[in-house]
Amino acid sequence: MKENVASMIVFLLLLFLNIRLLKGQSPPGKPFIFKCRSPEKETFTCWWRPGADGGLPTNYTLTYHKEGETITHECPDYKTGGPNSCYFSKKHTSIWTIYIITVNATNQMGSSVSDPRYVDVTYIVEPDPPVNLTLEVKHPEDRKPYLWVKWLPPTLVDVRSGWLTLQYEIRLKPEKAAEWETHFAGQQTQFKILSLYPGQKYLVQVRCKPDHGFWSVWSPESSIQIPNDFTMKDITVWIFVAVLSTIICLIMVWAVALKGYSMVTCIFPPVPGPKIKGFDTHLLEKGKSEELLSAFGCQDFPPTADCEDLLVEFLEVDDSEDQQLMPAHSKEHSGPGMKPTDLDPDNDSGRGSCDSPSLLSEKCEEPQANPSTFHTPEVIEQPEKPKANVTHTWDPQTISLVGKMPYLSVNGSKSSTWPLLQPGQHNTNSPYHNIADMCKLATSLDKIDKDALQSSKTTEAAGEEKATKQREVESSHSKAEQDTGWLLPKEKPPFISPKPLDYVEIHKVNKDGALSLLLKQKENGDQTGKAGTPETSKEYAKVSRVMDNNILVLVQDPGAQNVALFEESTKEAPPSPSQNQAEKDLSSFSTAPSDCRLQQGGLDYLDPACFMHSLH
């Protein structure tokens, strides 16, 4: 019986425990401190969130202690901050002190403790929102209308003493808009907002934040209605500007229609014409540069020609045959009407020396004293001395050459083909003569040649007849040019040229007066082996004389003359007392025919004396 009673008691106890477990009673859950806030950095409040109560009434207690202390304190005020909060008054708040705070939950089934929270009052400041938010639309006279926003700092914050420094932020939007427009105002408590839409109702809010802390909540919304005539004045101004611009445009169109030409002339003045006297604008437009330059008195462009035809187109013909018909000894036996030729260092005709810088440099370096000259006497008189009457027998070929070729005196330096003016001569005859004068010259020279070939002896009568022929030549050239002297400048060491002596034959005369020449190789039995084809010259050439059968003898000017060769040849063949001056010159030059042709870096000219040996 006693055993049954004991088992019954155990069963009832187990049943009671199961009933209590089925009702959910347990120890409380762990609470959580989620926020601590100080509105003015003098007091602060902490809030927690409780855990599960276990089906039983639960008691919550907040305890704290300061860092470095062991004494634990309980919350001084559970009511000021609201439920589940603890308020710390100024008495219990310290700056620059760290608080270690915990929350304890206790019921009949047990207790639990929250995680500790470390709080520094300086960094948990969250002020209240600003107060007395005011909105106003202002219309200044000199500027556009704008929205004027004003507010006051929170009441609890001591801003005047500088205990806290607040910064403000404003946001606004139209009433029906979804997004806010935010403006940062800084530390000022007023702000201007521009560019508002007329007729709209705007909502405005403001908030603040300390230097170290959090933004406050937004203040309550404030609204304002923007009037419809907010931009009417601007529209009126634009309408006025448009009307005024239209009137100005109409006035300008009317003025242009009445005085269009005058206004165009005033805005775009015409280009002034040329002020030069005698200037023809038509020549400038047509592009005729020759006529335009001649109008200014300028020289025309030099003639252009193919370099292959320079020998024919720019052949220089010298028809002063009278000078070359007279032998060199006429200098010693000149008549009373003969005037001595003045010495001139150079008289460049402009044809040869322009293309020969070496000749010009040589002439500048050579001394110019005592040059030898050729003379052309006007009258040939009979010599008074008996030895001048001695007769000599010459062959016809020698007579022809004596009458046609000028000779160098033995004591002269070197022959030159540069013409010089006589003392009484003031104008220079052009080297390019008329075709009629050239024909007259060729006829007269041909006649002289034939008369010279018919004579067999040289006598006094022959000398007089020769003078008569010379006068005929002078009369044929009286219209063309005056007598020209030939200067013999001093020489420099020569360069012996291996080129053979050449002749040219007149092929035809074109309408411009230019001579077409055919090169003709010299025909001499003893010089045939040395003759060669003449090189094509791209320089100017000078004609020494015109022989029979229309053959021109080309004269080329050597760069220098070897005086030593001439003197040596003179010593080897000394002249006899009965010889005249012409025979002396002939004997001195006939000893060195191969050395007569010299060459220099400029133009290649031939000395007339060199033909004496080649024509035998």
From Swiss-Prot:
A Pfam family matched in the record: EpoR_lig-bind
Residues that carry a glycan: N59, N104, N132
Gene Ontology CC terms, in alphabetical order: external side of plasma membrane; receptor complex
Protein name: Prolactin receptor
Region (Disordered): 326-375, 454-492, 568-593
UniProt biased composition (Basic and acidic residues): 463-482
Subunit structure: Interacts with SMARCA1. Interacts with NEK3 and VAV2 and this interaction is prolactin-dependent.
InterPro entries in alphabetical order: FN3_dom, FN3_sf, Growth/epo_recpt_lig-bind, Ig-like_fold, Long_hematopoietin_rcpt_CS, Type-I_Cytokine_Rcpt
One annotated GO molecular function: peptide hormone binding
PANTHER family linked to this entry: CYTOKINE RECEPTOR (PTHR23036), PROLACTIN RECEPTOR (PTHR23036:SF86)
GO terms under biological process: positive regulation of cell population proliferation
Residue intervals annotated with topology Cytoplasmic: 259-616
Swiss-Prot/TrEMBL domain comment: The WSXWS motif appears to be necessary for proper protein folding and thereby efficient intracellular transport and cell-surface receptor binding. The box 1 motif is required for JAK interaction and/or activation.
Family statement: Belongs to the type I cytokine receptor family. Type 1 subfamily.
Residues spanning the membrane: 235-258
Organism: Oryctolagus cuniculus (Rabbit)
Cited function: This is a receptor for the anterior pituitary hormone prolactin.
Motif stretch (Box 1 motif): 267-275
Regions annotated as coiled coil: none
Native organism taxonomy: Eukaryota, Metazoa, Chordata, Craniata, Vertebrata
Record's keyword terms, sorted: Disulfide bond, Glycoprotein, Membrane, Metal-binding, Receptor, Repeat, Signal, Transmembrane, Transmembrane helix, Zinc
